[in-house]
Amino acid sequence: MANTPQARKRIRRNERRAEINGNRLSRIRTFVKKVETALAGGDKTAAAEALKAAQPELARGVARGVLHKNTVARKMSRLTKRVASL
């Protein structure tokens, strides 16, 4: 139980931030999933378009502090390699 006003405020703030960050992560996962489904379908143009849309979302995740930059770099690299290999 939070005993100080500051601790109570931090709890409220953390709940709000957790919801916002969860929404951001969900949005990023959706964009990555679009690339994955296009890759599974074997459609190179759709996969390239989906990747083009996903890259700024991933970068935004880094800027907002939702994802680590190395995680995003790894994901982008792997997706780009898979799209190029189609």
Swiss-Prot record:
Keywords: Ribonucleoprotein, Ribosomal protein, RNA-binding, rRNA-binding
Gene3D superfamilies: Ribosomal protein S20 (1.20.58.110)
An MF annotation (GO) of this entry: structural constituent of ribosome
Gene Ontology cellular component annotations, sorted alphabetically: small ribosomal subunit
rRNA-binding listed as a keyword: yes
Listed InterPro entries: Ribosomal_bS20, Ribosomal_bS20_sf
Domain of life: Bacteria
Pfam families: Ribosomal_S20p
SUPFAM superfamilies noted in UniProt: Ribosomal protein S20
BP GO annotations: translation
Family classification: Belongs to the bacterial ribosomal protein bS20 family.
Function (record text): Binds directly to 16S ribosomal RNA.
Protein known as: Small ribosomal subunit protein bS20
